[in-house]
Amino acid sequence: MRRITMDPEMNTSISSIRSQEILDSRGNPTVEATVLLDCGITGTASVPSGASTGIHESQELRDNDPKRYKGKGVLHVVEKSIPAIETLLKGMSVNDQRAIDRNMIELDGTPEKKVLGANAILAVSLACARAGAIASDIPLYTYLRKIYWPDVAGWILPVPQMNVLNGGKHAPGSVDMQEFMIMPVKAPSFVEALRMGSQTYHALKSLLLEKKLPVGVGDEGGFMPKVSSHEEMLTVLVDAIRLAGYEPGNDIVIGLDPAASEFFENGAYMLKTENATLTSSELIAHYQSWTEKFPVVSIEDGLSEDDWDGFVDMMKKMGDRVQIVGDDLFVTHPDRLTKGIELHAANAILVKLNQIGTLSETADVISQARQAGLKTIISHRSGETEDAFIADLAVACNAGQIKSGAPCRIERVAKYNRLLHIERELQSSSQFATFSFLR
């Protein structure tokens, strides 16, 4: 991060906000915002977009002009929403992040942020935080810690959940379930965890080539081979871990994100790969079987986003030994998280900034989950940019886990490289989360 010479009289009021339509990693438009302060400092941020989105998420604003980007353009955000936000925030101190976010929420006036667009609001929210950190002459993770988690002690570098085999909406033509992830939990540091993950990724590629399976990659950098079953995907993954020289279940464990809402049709789970139609109980039985055969320790969105009874049943049957993660179930929303806590529907939450649409609301959900004893995983989206904000966020709140895709494609690797830099900055004052953070 660029260092500056601090001036006690520095004016950190917001002078102007600029924005631009840029492309995300899937070639679709997204929003980049730059906040300029009176003192001359700027902060820039860009926002991601999901493919398998929960129906309860905040709403992005798109142009819906079929002549531009098949309707996915964001010129309305750039030309209308951001100028309206600029008028609102001009003259405010960039250091008052909660007031900035609150004012944007009130200006929009809808729970889904559908007037200004969650993509407009979040871009400005993150850009303000970045400008505030630069103006304060401290790293972004330290700045976020001071604002939202001042009582949290120590610095934890997160275990990466690396999506090395892709299916579902991230990889058309592969299996139904979306993500098969490796988690290098035995590493002594993040730098070693990244090495272990990368070496396993390359071992996996070699194994797929040996089996004459395709090695093209999906949206998140994982391979998307055409195999006959989900168990075959898991078998290949375990073989790759061994080929890389690691012990499955000890050095490296496996996480799944089935994204079950995407194959939930007419009240049943349709696994076209196996030509099977399953009830919630039958799908849970599949998961139970897999955790016995393979070192699967985390299952995210194993059931559809409104299958609350199914999640409760899954927790009763597996929650004592498996991390049951709510993503589409919770959509980083306090009300849905409250319901999940009351029902005991999950023991972990996936946190995505653009699901709720402001930094402050995201931070509050993280704190709510922590207070209830849920594990927290900070996550990217399938349509990403080079912005590595989530790396700083994961360290700021001591999340202990982060999802940023495979160690492939620069928009994924940018987050991992940022964590390398943070670990080097913190040196002996930080520790790696390791397997204990899953318990």
Label every PLM stretch briefly:
Residues 37-41, 82, 86-93, 104, ...:
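Structural signal for hydrophobic packing residues in well-ordered secondary-structure cores
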Residues 21, 31-39, 43-49, 162-184, ...:
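Short beta-strand elements
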Residues 28, 72-80, 92-102, 119, ...:
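Conserved active-site and cofactor/substrate-binding residues in soluble primary-metabolism enzymes
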Residues 48-138, 147, 194, 222:
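Metal- or metallocofactor-binding catalytic centers and their adjacent structured scaffolds
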